[in-house]
């Protein structure tokens, strides 16, 4: 007896009005993740994954392109408002926020969540080049 062909159901995207953009800006790369309020990832993009390699990966323009790609990835969820959490000292901090604003999101809050030790571990020794 032959089985009936299994039809793939079209995946229904849940509609989210408010989201959180997590920006991790290191000296070498920028990672942009947009989540819902509970922290479930809806879409993400990186400067390295956007086609930039080597030292070009750590530029503000690469971070801007990553933010635009992440914004395109989550457009179908219907996000209108974004809360932005920025972590790290990298060059892509400001340009990422500008790109998200230009993509049509209304930025409600910008928070710096860079981890700062209360005199924790000893830092690595200084580089000698």
From Swiss-Prot:
It comes from the Bacteria. SUPFAM superfamilies: Translational machinery components. Belongs to the universal ribosomal protein uS11 family. This is Small ribosomal subunit protein uS11. GO terms for cellular component: ribonucleoprotein complex; ribosome. InterPro entries: Ribosomal_uS11, Ribosomal_uS11_bac-type, Ribosomal_uS11_CS, Ribosomal_uS11_sf. Located on the platform of the 30S subunit, it bridges several disparate RNA helices of the 16S rRNA. Forms part of the Shine-Dalgarno cleft in the 70S ribosome. It comes from Salmonella paratyphi B (strain ATCC BAA-1250 / SPB7). One of its GO terms (molecular function) is rRNA binding. Keywords: Ribonucleoprotein, Ribosomal protein, RNA-binding, rRNA-binding.
